[in-house]
Amino acid sequence: RLDARVVLLVCDRPGAYVCERAARLGVETFAFRPKDYVSKEAYEQDIVRMLDERGVELVCLAGYMRILSRVMLDAYGGRIVNIHPSLLPAFKGAHAIRDAFEYGVKVYGVTVHYVNDELDGGKIIAQRAFDYTGADVQELEAMVHAVEHPLYVEAIAGLPAGRHR
C-alpha cells in the first residue's frame, strides 16, 4: 500500500483507457491534445497550474512519452519521477524493450528515476533486474510490465515525504 492520494491524472491521449479507469476510481482527469496548443510550454503551463491548484507534491510519470520542457522542470524539478523499462543508463528512450531485445541482452530490468533535463538521465531511485532468454519480444514486454508496476509503488513509498529534491 502507498500512503498517498492520487489527485489528478494528466493524459495526452483523450479516450485512453487510463482515463476511464481513473474516472471509475473517482480521480479527476485532464485529458488534452497537444496539437490544440500553440506549444509544449503552453500545455505544460496548464498542467503546472492544475498541479499547483491541487497542492501536488510528487508527479509520477507512466507512459508519458514526451520530453518535459523547462516549464515543468522549473516548477516541479526534483519532484517528478518516471518508470523506465530498462536498467538505466542502458537503453534510454522510447524503444528500450525492443532495443535491449534486439541487442540480445540476457538480463533485463526496470528503473525508477527522477526526471531532469536529460532523457532518462535523472538520479536513479530503484532498479529491479530479471533474466530472460526467450525469443518473444511480446512475452518480454509482459514480463517488464509485471516488474514495473510493483517496483514503482515500492520506490514511491520509499521516498521521504515532502523531501523529493
Mark where each language-model region is.
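Donor/substrate-binding cores of folate-linked one-carbon enzymes
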Residues: 12, 58, 62-164
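Short phosphate-binding loop-to-helix
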Residues: 35-61, 66
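Short, surface-exposed connector motifs at secondary-structure boundaries
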Residues: 1-5, 54-56, 79-81
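Short, surface-exposed acidic-centric catalytic microdomains
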Residues: 1-46
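Generic alpha-helical structural signal
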Residues: 23, 45-48, 141, 153
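Anion (oxyanion) recognition and catalysis
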Residues: 23, 52, 101
